[in-house]
Amino acid sequence: MTSESEPLDWRASLSSADRYDNIQAIKAALEHSDLPASATHQDAFSIENEAYKTSSSRDQYDAACRIKPGREPPLPTELAQPAAAPDEAPESPGIIIGSYQSCHYVASGVTAEVYRSKVTALKVIVETRNIEPHDPFREAKILKLLEKPCIPLLDTFRDQEQRFTLAFPFMPLSLEALVKQGPIPIDRIRRHFRDLFTALSYIHERGIIHRDIKPSALLLESIDGPAYLSDFGTAWHPELSVSTEPADQKILDIGTGPYRAPEALFGDKAYGTAVDMWGAGTMLAECCRKSPQPLFESRAAHEDGNQLGLILSIFKSIGSPTKESWPEAAKFKTPPFEMYQVFEGRSWEDLLPDVGVEFRELIAALVKYNSSNRATAPEALQFKCMTETNN
């Protein structure tokens, strides 16, 4: 039984090693179930993360992580019951973080945990080791230089445990949440992507590369917007980053899953802002589908072969690159030519048959191998699908 002295935020006493051990234990148990072997690792991560998010005590968390061999994995909370309304008041009193009262856990990432205190979101840095390209201090410096539609930084401080914390306006939704709900109306897609391209225009004009464009990085004030570009934890800045990452020696471990640009996959350390435009193009394709799903297939980052799987999915979808379609790749450390089976690829009409021609034109202009040929953010805003009021 949980002791009376256990802190309200029981997660503070849980180490990364504890979580890893639980994931491995869950994985071992699932290997004895009827699940295919390829699914057990991802399900283990999902089960542990669900327990971490929803448990009210360490005992409850530990119990949720104890999966008996042969037992079917529990249904994730978001599928088992309706999600609470974004403005619904939590039942527990929450915890105190700095001067913020009634803080409630929302989510966690590689280096941070996010809490909500009324209208404020608090990003608490819990991983203090240097995990490049993650740098919360650089993130804060970059955010202070930006304006809407980039997410506004309200404050930074050290909490009671001396953990660095960033404060933002709380946004109840993200583009990722809309994608999970099903088809998105065209006018809504247009509105949110106008905000995204406007934000990218703003940061790219200043030489900043976001490096992790994905649906969860676009936060929404409401289902109809406005949208704000967030998650600058791995962003590259021409002045703030250059001491550890020279412009021609940037880190390659950037991006998330199916939104990663091919130049980073093939070792081009001199990549530029076009990596963001590739990510935006793949996001747009996903959102425009009647049944939203990623344009390319990619295994979870922790799974073996995730990068190769993404490369093959790209090649099979839009065709293997050639020296004519991707001339800049000839100078890469690992050129993609003559290394893989040659795939002809498919037309955009075949890849996205249920997407309007105007949106397909923009997607095709963004999802190109040669980065110098991709549409820029200001150019994207001038495409017909972005300027129309109806489609």
Regions found by a protein language model. Name each.
Residues 192-193:
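Activation segment signature within eukaryotic-like protein kinase domains
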Residues 161-174:
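Conserved short submotifs of the Hanks-type protein kinase catalytic core
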Residues 316-364:
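C-terminal lobe substrate-recognition/regulatory segment of protein kinase catalytic domains
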Residues 204-221:
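Catalytic-loop of the protein kinase fold
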Residues 113-127:
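Glycine-rich ATP phosphate-binding loop
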Residues 152-164:
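Short beta-strand micro-motifs within the conserved protein kinase catalytic domain, predominantly
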